[in-house]
Curated annotation (Swiss-Prot):
Short name of any one Pfam family annotated for the protein: Complex1_49kDa
Root EC class: translocase
Gene that encodes the chain: nuoD
Assembly description: NDH-1 is composed of 14 different subunits. Subunits NuoB, C, D, E, F, and G constitute the peripheral sector of the complex.
EC number per UniProt: 7.1.1.-
Record's keyword annotation contains Ribosomal protein: no
Protein name: NADH-quinone oxidoreductase subunit D
Gene Ontology MF term list: NAD binding; NADH:ubiquinone reductase (non-electrogenic) activity; quinone binding
Organism of derivation: Brucella anthropi (strain ATCC 49188 / DSM 6882 / CCUG 24695 / JCM 21032 / LMG 3331 / NBRC 15819 / NCTC 12168 / Alc 37) (Ochrobactrum anthropi)
SUPFAM superfamilies for this protein: HydB/Nqo4-like (SSF56762)
Function as written in the Swiss-Prot or TrEMBL entry: NDH-1 shuttles electrons from NADH, via FMN and iron-sulfur (Fe-S) centers, to quinones in the respiratory chain. The immediate electron acceptor for the enzyme in this species is believed to be ubiquinone. Couples the redox reaction to proton translocation (for every two electrons transferred, four hydrogen ions are translocated across the cytoplasmic membrane), and thus conserves the redox energy in a proton gradient.
Keywords, comma-separated and alphabetical: Cell inner membrane, Cell membrane, Membrane, NAD, Quinone, Translocase, Transport, Ubiquinone
UniProt xrefs under NCBIfam families: NuoD, PRK06075.1
Protein's cellular compartments: Cell inner membrane
Translocase as UniProt keyword: yes
Length: 396
């Protein structure tokens, strides 16, 4: 009897797979149930964001940033606003900085709650997402009360934030923090010691530190491998250098370590939020929330009713926009998924000449083949969950 040639088996994972978190398509080459090769096919959500931004004024380009990592929108706006501010050479008043930091940390918790609970769901735990989404709903309401939108906020503007927060809202955010620790402890008790969750995540998708640097990882992916690299501490922006918080780091670099770091980061974010709330209700209770330069920040409604000059400024800002001095700048923030950077090139006009977006998820997804080789097919979704990928920013 003639021998039959045994070939590896190719399957498609996605593009509409429940564990793929969006429009991911992986072409997997399997030897039995062991993964030999992973080929991510991206671009299914490509919208040409970077090109579209070149046709808009600096203010009009801002909402595109919300639509990248749409799980934590304000963190992307933050990087863009910082880049424009550096080119313009303007600074943000203290109250505006505190509001930005407060909402950036809310974004981090929004992101980690979604990731940790869906990571648990990917390996078969159905309760955590229900608990996580209950807390996310409350945070979305805080987003809505600040700017009117639950997701695409367009709240951070170059020069500060769009409008001040009412005291009642800041108080409500303060009241939310302590009960949130209870929710986190409940999640912790449910998932962390769970035997099945551990078996599915411990020693899966291990990344050594030198590999993490070589692949261009950032955020949790680097901290899970043992480096205390967090832009909020290593290259502080806004008022992070005045905040007290710790950077959790892992030592095994596996999926379980990355999960534990995200859990601890939510606690640290809540600590930062508590400090912001205390300052916003105390020492910084009154004060401007955006730069006073009316050539960049539009005047207030009441001012426009009284002053013709203010009306003209407002009209010019929303039709022509402001001209940014020629130059180039790179601004990066510690977004929930890693280092989100904006490389902005200005030619002196009212529109960006080029805006390159450095999405952390893009660098993490490219290592999918490296991470999954030799693992079982079932581990692919566990590894994917621990990478924390959102396709808005990968495909741009």
């Amino acid at each position: 009897m003639a021998e039959t040639q045994v070939r590896n088996f190719n399957i498609n994972f996605g593009p509409q797979h429940p564990a793929a978190h969006g429009v991911l398509r992986l072409v997997l080459e399997l030897d039995g149930e062991v993964v030999e090769r992973v080929d991510p096919h991206i671009g299914l959500l490509h919208r040409g964001t970077e090109k579209l931004m070149e046709a808009k004024t600096y203010l009009q380009a801002l909402p595109y940033l919300d639509r990248l990592d749409y799980v934590a929108p304000m963190n992307q706006e933050h990087a863009y606003a910082l880049a424009v501010e550096r080119l313009l050479g303007i600074d943000v008043p203290k109250r505006g900085q505190l509001i930005r930091v407060l909402y950036s940390e809310i974004g981090r918790i929004l992101n980690h709650l979604l990731n940790v609970t869906t990571q648990a769901m990917d390996v078969g735990a159905l309760t955590p997402p229900l608990w996580g989404f209950e807390e996310r709903e409350k945070l979305m309401v805080f987003y809505e009360r600040a700017c009117g939108a639950r997701m695409h906020a367009a709240y951070f503007r170059p020069g500060g934030v769009h409008q001040d927060l009412p005291d009642q809202l800041v108080e409500d955010i303060g009241k939310w923090i302590d009960p949130f620790f209870n929710t986190l402890n409940n999640l912790d008790d449910l998932i962390t010691p769970n035997r099945i969750f551990k078996q599915r995540n411990v020693d899966i998708g291990v990344v050594k530190l030198e590999d993490a640097w070589a692949w261009g990882f950032s955020g949790v992916m680097v901290r899970g491998s043992g480096a205390a690299w967090d832009l909020r501490k290593s290259q502080p922006y806004e008022c992070y250098n005045e905040m007290e918080f710790d950077i959790p780091i892992g030592k095994n670099g596996d999926c379980y370590d990355r999960y534990l770091i995200r859990m601890e980061e939510m606690r640290q974010s809540a600590r930062i939020m508590r400090q912001c709330v205390d300052l916003l209700l105390g020492k910084e209770r009154v004060g401007p929330v955006s730069n006073a330069d009316n050539k960049i920040v539009p005047p207030k409604r009441g001012e426009m009713k009284r002053s013709m000059e203010a009306l003209i400024h407002h009209f010019k800002l929303y039709t022509e926009g402001y001209h940014v001095p020629a130059g180039e700048v790179y601004a990066a923030v510690e977004a929930p998924k890693g280092e989100f950077g904006v490389f902005l090139v200005s030619d002196g006009s009212n529109k960006p000449y080029r805006c390159k977006l450095r999405a952390p998820g893009f660098a993490h997804l490219q290592a999918m083949d490296f991470l999954c080789r030799g693992h079982m097919l079932a581990d692919v979704s566990a590894i994917l969950g621990s990478l924390d990928i959102v396709f808005g920013e990968v495909d741009r």
